Amino acid sequence: NSPGYPSNVQFVFNMGGAMGDTSWLEAGDAPMVAFHPVGDPFAPYGVGNVIVPTTGQFVVEVGGSREAIRLSNEKGNNACFANAGFTDALTTYANTVNEGFEGLYPLYTNPAQQAGPWEWFDSTATVFYASFLPPPYNTAGGTAYSSALITNPDMSKAKALAYLDTIMGYLNPRVVYCLNLS
């Protein structure tokens, strides 16, 4: 762990990420919930390659959200919420598409190959703030915004907030339940 940061993690959640080495997961680790676009072109939903968004270059094979949650369930780490009896609409939906992996919320996007549908930012602000960076990055704001649209073509605040609402609606009851916060 990094010096100065505590390592007594009590709950983990992930949005579109992956584990560099799934052997890091051990029985007794914190419960885990993950949200992941199934067609994410950069970080695999299952087991696969991480790709650099700007170059398309291979980085490393990793375990995506599906694999991390599968292993977390296999090791009993999600037992605190697996049988909690959640019956809300988000849980009901997740359970129809997550192959029985409690804590996994697959995101089926349109178009299918999207990364980070919960992201949005203002093109004017992006260009403006980039102008304060040293060359050659000071002219990259427009490129950054245009590149983001490739994998999130209908990016908007309304879309992002709808995804974040779903994420919070599914995640928060599990955190509250497992950490006895009610």
Regions flagged by a language model, labelled:
Residues N1, N14, V97-G100, Q113, ...:
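Generic detector of intrinsically disordered, low-complexity, polar/charged segments
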Residues N1-G28:
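Primarily recognizes the serine-hydrolase "nucleophile elbow" in alpha/beta-hydrolase
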Residues N8, G63-L71, T166, Y170, ...:
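Extracytoplasmic/secreted proteins, especially bacterial periplasmic and envelope-associated proteins
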Residues G17, N73-N77, V176, N180:
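Sec-exported extracytoplasmic/periplasmic mature domains
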Residues D21, E26, P44, E61-G64, ...:
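Alpha-helix initiation/capping motif
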Residues A30-T124, A130:
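Active-site-adjacent alpha-helix of alpha/beta-hydrolase-fold enzymes
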Residues T109-S182:
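Catalytic active-site module of serine/aspartate enzymes centered on a nucleophile-bearing elbow/loop
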